[in-house]
Amino acid sequence: MFFMSCTRQAPQVERLHVEGTVLMNESGDTVELKGMSFGWNVLWPRFYNADAVAHVVNDWGSEIVRAAVGVEIDDDECVVKNYLTDPDFGKQSACTIVDAAIENGVYVLVDWHAHGLHTEAAVEFFTYIASRYKGVPNVIYEIWNEPSYKDHVNQIDYTWAEIKEYSETVIAAIRAIEKDAVIVVGTPRWSQNVDDAANDPIIGYDNLMYTLHFYAGTHKEWLREKGDYAMSKGLALFVTECGGMNADGQGPVDEESTQAWIEWMEDNDISYLFWSISDKEETCSMLLPSARSEGPWAEEDLRPWGKFVKEQL
């Protein structure tokens, strides 16, 4: 007797790897992923649901999504919900986005969305994620979003040596479980100084990439020159977050500068994600408060940045 299964299988994606400065799939094709980052899970948890992921994939054309797991944010409205105070909430948020990305056949960045150094917590988090999704080709690990001031009062940044030591520890924890997955490493000064990493890269591991973030209203040709230098030294770059406005998330969208960045990324086969799926009163939030948590989002639910991003994707 013949039985037919009615279970729908999730679309499959090819496993990715790094060759030289580019991301490639199992077929040997160069891959440049384009997509959207969800905002901080602790600030906009309402968008962390499977329907929202399906909407940005199927309606907006996102090839990759990013779960931004807020680590140490101390906003009065969510102080009890950051990862350090409620790790289960952070894991749940990440897994919701990962599971939905798998279901919709796209890639997903699991982003440790921190500015400070939290090695023990990061190892615990990525050990959990790697164990849960071992062998799943959709998952990419972003182990430190934007290293910034370790001393805000005196404006002292984390050095590349400190970031490198942290990264080697977290990479080792992931590699103990997941041998080949792509891992993206943060770089100094809000993931801008990729040239520092290029001068002293992490060795002993394959499939590593390095983070470059830009906000086109603030960051111009001088930052692309840092990227060019890093690639000339053999680093593979991943723009895991970017925006068309000023670095503080405000100001008008500088479309000319944003297009210059997009052309540069496409010329160099660099994957990129736009920031962010959120509804805050700021330029970099794509949505208005009228937007439904699960989507779909009509044109009248989009801020100008959201309309720009949707057109780009």
Language model feature labels by segment:
Residues E32-L33, A67-G70, D74-E77, F89, ...:
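A short alpha-helix capping/helix-coil boundary motif
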Residues N49-Y128, I163, E168-E178, D254-D269:
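Aromatic-lined substrate-binding rim segments of carbohydrate-active enzymes
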Residues M1-F2:
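Bacterial N-terminal signal peptides
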Residues C6-I64, F308-Q312:
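N-terminal carbohydrate-binding accessory modules
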Residues N25, D111, E241:
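Acidic active-site catalytic centers that drive phospho-/nucleotidyl reactions
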Residues S27-V53, V69-D88, A247-Q250, E294-W297:
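Acidic/histidine-rich helix-loop elements
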Residues R15-L16, W40, P45, Y107, ...:
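Extracellular glycoside hydrolase catalytic/binding regions
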